Amino acid sequence: MTVFETKYTVKPAHIDELNHVNNVVYLQWIQDIANLHWTQLKRGVDTTAYVWVVIRHEIDYIGQALMGDTIVAKTWVGKTGGIRSIRHVEFYKNNKLIVRAQTTFCLVNAKTFKPTRITNQILMMLAPK
C-alpha cells in the first residue's frame, strides 16, 4: 500500500460549540486529501473523461482535535474493481489515531454521469507501487 500524507492545522473556523474540530471539517479534509492524492496519482495522464463520485462514507471518531493542533492525515487506496474504489483515511494528533474513515467512490463518465467500469489504466494508477 502506498500512503499519501498531508498536514492540517486546526483554525478557529474548524471549531464547533464543543470547542473541538467539527465532524463536517473532517469530512471536508477527507475530500481534500482524496483530491490531493488523486491529483498526484494521475499526474501526466488525461483522465478528463471520468470523475469520481462518493457513494458512501464511514467515519469513526476516536479522539478529538483542538484549536492550534497539527493533524497528520494519511490516505491510501484499498480494494478497487468494477466501478468502485475504496479509499482509507486516518487522522493523527501527536501520533495517536483520532479519526478513521473509509470512503467508497464510483467512477462515472464525465459527460453522461453514468457509472463506468474502472479502466486498466486507472487501475494501474491506483495499484500500490
Task: Show the residue positions of the predicted features.
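Terminal targeting signals and extreme-terminal segments of soluble enzymes
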Residues: M1-V72, K79-K129
